[in-house]
Amino acid sequence: GHFILTNRLLPLMQTKNNGRIVHVSSRSGYGQAPAVGIDFDNLRGEKSFDAGQAYGRSKLANALFSLELAQRLQGTGLSSNAIHPGLVQTNIARTAPVLMRSAFEWFGGVIAKSPAQGAATQLYVATSPQLEGVSGAYFEDCNPVVISGQNHMTDSAMAKKLWATAQSMCGQYLT
């Protein structure tokens, strides 16, 4: 996954002292994730599973990974940021129940971004000279967004715990 790939590429990136890592997160990271944030006692959904919360939790995990990586990259010339691409015209709902899929396709066709529009923020964060040295931020529509309220998107303690858990789970693949 993201954790292994990024950690395997970091040594190469660090030889250049310049580079940007952009993580695709989502508003779902704070809108759909359960109130507990990352449920470390139910990571694989073995106790209970809700598809919407699982999606939100995965996007929260991407944002937390980006946040912790930004801390670890301080002073290296590398940066880590997370983005929300917006609602993009994709086939993400292809396996949803028929009613939900139909609603998503209709609603998405009316207000969703094209794939090119959905990629704009990711490309901006990856390439804009204006963002040189910016790390640990979250972007929507090519703008930094400050996340506030009752959520875990900026929970550095949870980000550290998630990193440690991922290291423990993936350790054999990191060397």
Regions found by a protein language model. Give the residues of each.
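A short C-terminal helix-loop "cap" of Rossmann-like NAD(P)-dependent dehydrogenase/epimerase domains
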Residues: L43-E46, L99-F107
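Short, contiguous clusters of charged residues that form electrostatic/catalytic patches at enzyme active sites
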Residues: L64, A120, A164
